[in-house]
């Protein structure tokens, strides 16, 4: 929906962190005229994406690699879901700049990933809330606790205000929060 506000019926959309293809499938089904490029560093995930997409592959090109491997085309939009939280601030800024470089002026970028306050108490509180939500959804308490410990130790999480600042530094404006669910946040921003 956020991309469709500005992407033409025959638009080109870059999906960074394409994973198993669920996002690509949703786009291809909702917007059959779009040409989609899915980029992901994991060949097994791209193989799964191909299976997930089935006959919709006629609208999709898959590329194994990172943003630097994506063609230097001007896309009408891009998305990057559940990916940026794996990158430290420097890598994240580089990735956002490279996404920006591949977008038409005014093109939307949708990102969503873990983002929590960086003060120790705030970070702990939001991760505990995420674990509690998991438990309420049927995840075993021990598994939920292990998950948030792994997130805290392994992911270079940034605060929401840092995320907005990086988007702006990379050349995006009109940054808007469109989703907040415990530790997950989503923003839409537009290439200048």
Where do the language-model regions lie?
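A short glycine-rich, Lys/Arg-flanked "PGG" loop and its adjoining helix->strand segment in the class I
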Residues: 93-105
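Conserved beta-strand signature within the Rossmann-like core of class I S-adenosyl-L-methionine
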Residues: 106-114
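C-terminal alpha-helical "lid/dimerization" subdomain adjacent to the S-adenosyl-L-methionine
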Residues: 114-168
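A short beta-strand submotif of the Rossmann-like class I SAM-dependent methyltransferase core
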Residues: 80-83
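A short acidic, Gly/Pro-enriched loop at the edge of an enzyme's catalytic core
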Residues: 70-78
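Class I SAM-dependent methyltransferase SAM/SAH-binding core
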Residues: 12-14, 20-69
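Conserved alpha-helix/loop element of class I SAM-dependent methyltransferases that forms part
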Residues: 1-10
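Core SAM-dependent methyltransferase catalytic element
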Residues: 170-192
């Amino acid at each position: 929906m956020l991309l469709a506000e500005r992407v033409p019926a025959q638009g080109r959309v870059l999906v960074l962190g394409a994973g198993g293809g669920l996002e690509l499938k949703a786009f291809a089904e909702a917007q059959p005229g779009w040409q989609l490029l899915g980029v992901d560093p994991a060949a097994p995930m791209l193989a799964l994406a191909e299976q997930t997409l089935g006959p919709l592959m006629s609208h999709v090109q898959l590329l194994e690699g990172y943003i630097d491997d994506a063609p230097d085309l001007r896309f009408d939009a891009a998305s990057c879901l559940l990916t940026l939280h794996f990158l430290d601030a420097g890598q994240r800024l580089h990735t956002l700049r490279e996404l920006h470089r591949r977008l038409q002026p005014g093109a939307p970028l949708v990102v969503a990933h873990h983002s929590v306050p960086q003060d120790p108490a705030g970070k702990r509180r939001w991760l505990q809330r995420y674990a509690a939500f998991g438990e309420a959804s049927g995840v075993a308490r021990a598994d939920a606790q292990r998950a948030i410990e792994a997130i805290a130790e392994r992911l270079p999480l940034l605060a929401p205000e840092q995320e907005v600042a990086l988007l702006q530094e990379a050349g995006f404006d009109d940054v808007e929060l469109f989703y907040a669910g415990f530790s997950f946040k989503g923003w839409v921003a537009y290439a200048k």
